[in-house]
Amino acid sequence: MAKPYEFNWQKEVPSFLQEGAVFDRYEEESFVFEPNCLFKVDEFGFFLTWKSEGKEGQVLECSLINSIRLAAIPKDPKILAALESVGKSENDLEGRILCVCSGTDLVNIGFTYMVAENPEITKQWVEGLRSIIHNFRANNVSPMTCLKKHWMKLAFLTNTSGKIPVRSITRTFASGKTEKVIFQALKELGLPSGKNDEIEPAAFTYEKFYELTQKICPRTDIEDLFKKINGDKTDYLTVDQLVSFLNEHQRDPRLNEILFPFYDAKRAMQIIEMYEPDEELKKKGLISSDGFCRYLMSDENAPVFLDRLELYQEMDHPLAHYFISSSHNTYLTGRQFGGKSSVEMYRQVLLAGCRCVELDCWDGKGEDQEPIITHGKAMCTDILFKDVIQAIKETAFVTSEYPVILSFENHCSKYQQYQMSKYCEDLFGDLLLKQALESHPLEPGRLLPSPNDLKRKILIKNKRLKPEVEKKQLEALKSMMEAGESAAPASILEDDNEEEIESADQEEEAHPEYKFGNELSADDFSHKEAVANSVKKGLVTVEDEQAWMASYKYVGATTNIHPYLSTMINYAQPVKFQGFHVAEERNIHYNMSSFNESVGLGYLKTHAIEFVNYNKRQMSRIYPKGGRVDSSNYMPQIFWNAGCQMVSLNYQTPDLAMQLNQGKFEYNGSCGYLLKPDFMRRPDRTFDPFSETPVDGVIAATCSVQVISGQFLSDKKIGTYVEVDMYGLPTDTIRKEFRTRMVMNNGLNPVYNEESFVFRKVILPDLAVLRIAVYDDNNKLIGQRILPLDGLQAGYRHISLRNEGNKPLSLPTIFCNIVLKTYVPDGFGDIVDALSDPKKFLSITEKRADQLRAMGIETSDIADVPSDTSKNDKKGKANPAKANVTPQSSSELRPTTTAALGSGQEAKKGIELIPQVRIEDLKQMKAYLKHLKKQQKELNSLKKKHAKEHSTMQKLHCTQVDKIVAQYDKEKSTHEKILEKAMKKKGGSNCLEIKKETEIKIQTLTSDHKSKVKEIVAQHTKEWSEMINTHSAEEQEIRDLHLSQQCELLRKLLINAHEQQTQQLKLSHDRESKEMRAHQAKISMENSKAISQDKSIKNKAERERRVRELNSSNTKKFLEERKRLAMKQSKEMDQLKKVQLEHLEFLEKQNEQAKEMQQMVKLEAEMDRRPATVV
């Protein structure tokens, strides 16, 4: 159940304040003296009231009271005489006068003095009044409470007879209704209704006043909303209708459902019980339009989360992690040139929550040699330094306990610096932080202490001496003082240029002042008061001021620091800014630098991210540029976006910048410190304040504001209109675009009923603020309100307005409908809705099942069937095991490794489009075939040569064998012929011996012949075998050569093929990239055209913002697409190279196998070789 936040805005008012006491009252400026006034404070602490006999009742709003203090005895003789006349002599006044300081801004302060009967009463009332003022919670009460407050004010503003004049009531409603209508309404309520009538306070109850407001300015806007909720069917809302309204409209859908539960019937009944005035309806669980109106005007419907007004942030982070409310030239009440300086300004800004004030310190010119504070040589009046220190002491920790930083702009001599140091030490006492905390020593890399560590401490920001110089001078000072030399402080204080602070650490001029080209004389300074008065009275023309400004030049602060003052400087040591990289290298967290707004903007423009990172580590201070002599302010939001801590403003000027500042620092208990967002503190996060896309970890928001109506905007019959602006990051800032129509002649209850003003994309809600401002028909501001977006509540809300000084106005409110939700880019709405509420977005299958059920077919009747896959899926998934065991052809070049899944598969698909190369393909190439032909020709030529040599040797061998055979035959024939002749000659009987002898000779011849044949055959066999071996070797050699040439050629051809593949893939990639760019350009043009033709966009600025946002979104999207494409293409190229490498390795392996095969053939041939010859 949603729980209501208990807003305890009321402070306990002491009983003696409620009972009252008699004081004599006077005012010094206009000489008002009113004796015997009965002063009281109401039970709620809204008003300090007083009334004396025969006088009208008077009130002073406690929200306008800045301080209560004891006052000195007046010096005005008239006042002293008046007090003497009522029996209070000057000698009796000590400790009996209290001063009430009040005002609607920080400059125009009024002082009311109250003289008590005795000092005890004065002391009691000072403490009592101090306990109830500065109630920042009471500045955020609901419209219903504001109505009650106004009713109480009317009851206090009685006439001399103690009754309420009807005229004072008519003034409340004078802006929209005629007096007759008001008189008639009073008559209907049974109250006196004549123009000059009076009403008894007892008869004028709050309920009567509330009914009167409803009669004179009925809330038709809430009535219309009421009818819209119940469908205009009844005069009440049921519990269910109220719950539905609360959850759908009054609750931010982005909130965590556990921490911020939805409303339920029980909570709705609590609301009805609390706000429904009709008891009968309460019993029935119904709420009327009057009860509904009361609820919408209650604290439960505050426009901001009221707990954000408390101290809700962690205060234990380093100082550099906070925005710090800071003032520039705090002492000035007006212009920078010829302006008036005031001690009171220090009190007012500190009481307003400021935590960093500026003191421009100069040597006093009087005989007393007292240091003064003034805007150096800019013709401003002077105030005493010690008076300022006293004022700071009295007010530093009244509204906030967190540390105050005194930003010294030190132009004093060493002697007067010593006086300044002693004043700080003596007046501040333990409040002054003179030494660094033990837990946070002044060492590089050590974090700054937190606001909690420095509670109720005052820090001085001033240049500091080098440690060795400081130590040396302190020792000299100590020894001289111990020696009893009265002039010791003065002697050590003499300015010397030898021991100044390190030049590298001199601060870039933190606050440039003016001086004439020639030094001013004492006479020049004696005229400062007169010049200031002349400027104030308008006697000095703009031309004179410009001429004076032109003759001035800047004077820097002194670098010759007194060692005693130097010892008081710790966590705010200004140094000259030498660059972000230098600061990062030094890593000294207690060093800080100041930048005027122009320099700051320059660094922000060129080094935005570095500036943010610098501010994570150490502090920076921004101050207005010198040209702002009118004390106008720059826009602080720009520097908050960069994480700058001390964004110093001219508090005396309640312009837009100051309104933003005060509206922002109203959060976190108005303590003056706001914790920066997480990504602006963490060193591991990078933040660009000019980013146009959501920050990592931060959810962008959409905010729409519908301005419905206004209430009690003015007591005059004037026209009014409302402006709604947003300030934040440059991309989130929208100003001067959204304004309602002018409603004429009705300052009481104008109804605007405008269409919603939509801030479509707020990328950093943590830094954004909403500003709602009401102007009259002369464009004069009536009221405004600053609402930080991170604490804004959704729904129908009444927004109470503030004046330009951020003081609450009594009754003026704006009734708005605020819608907050997570930003969803165009085109993603359905997806987000489906994710946030899946029930509303059933799947197609579920929808079809519902449709079938509607036709009478039950779910049980529907069989589950396998999902059908596409042919491509089947191809990719069919028989994976079988595919893995299929043998590869030895001639195919395929990768042997398994490709990675996901993007690897995608890359693989890409290269599959490139034709694959096989060995067969390479062998069919023309170059390879030509080379084979050439090799075959060489081999044939060799074989032909070998055949010729075979034939020649064969003929030679045959001839030699034939010759031996012929010689054998011849010799054998000769022996046979000799035998035949001998036989014929001697006869057969006498030839036996000759025959025998002849046979022996023939045998010998045959034997010799065989021996010769055997020798010649052996010789021939040897010659033939050698020739065959030689021929075989030559043929094998040429075959080996040919094989090597073939392998090398195949390798070259494969490399060429790979180069062609690579080139082809590159061309494919270039074509893809070109097509993507063309497609992206087309999309960009179409989107821009759609925006230009979108009739729902009604102003040029919104259209330009949409186009800018679109371009930023498209740029990011397109870069991502190109990045993904580049990654895909890179993977494809890597995959191709991998496959090509595998192909090449495979070819090398095949070539090695071929060579091994060749060697085996050669070895087999050698093993099979036998001696041979040709016969």
UniProtKB/Swiss-Prot annotation:
It is an enzyme of class 3 (hydrolase). The modification N-acetylalanine is found at A2. Residues 493-508 have a biased composition (Acidic residues). Its EC number is 3.1.4.11. Keywords: Acetylation, Calcium, Cell membrane, Hydrolase, Lipid degradation, Lipid metabolism, Membrane, Phosphoprotein, Transducer. Residues 885-900, 1085-1094 have a biased composition (Polar residues). SMART domains: C2 (SM00239), PLCXc (SM00148), PLCYc (SM00149). The modification Phosphothreonine is found at T886. Preferentially expressed in the retina. InterPro entries: C2_dom (IPR000008), C2_domain_sf (IPR035892), EF-hand-dom_pair (IPR011992), PI-PLC_fam (IPR001192), PLC-beta (IPR016280), PLC-beta_C (IPR014815), PLC-beta_C_sf (IPR042531), PLC-beta_PH (IPR037862). Residues 1095-1109 have a biased composition (Basic and acidic residues). The active site is at H328, H375. Residues 684-809 form the C2 domain. Residues 565-681 form the PI-PLC Y-box domain. SUPFAM superfamilies: C-terminal domain of PLC-beta (SSF69989), C2 domain (Calcium/lipid-binding domain, CaLB) (SSF49562), EF-hand (SSF47473), PH domain-like (SSF50729), PLC-like phosphodiesterases (SSF51695). Its main location: membrane. This is 1-phosphatidylinositol 4,5-bisphosphate phosphodiesterase beta-4.
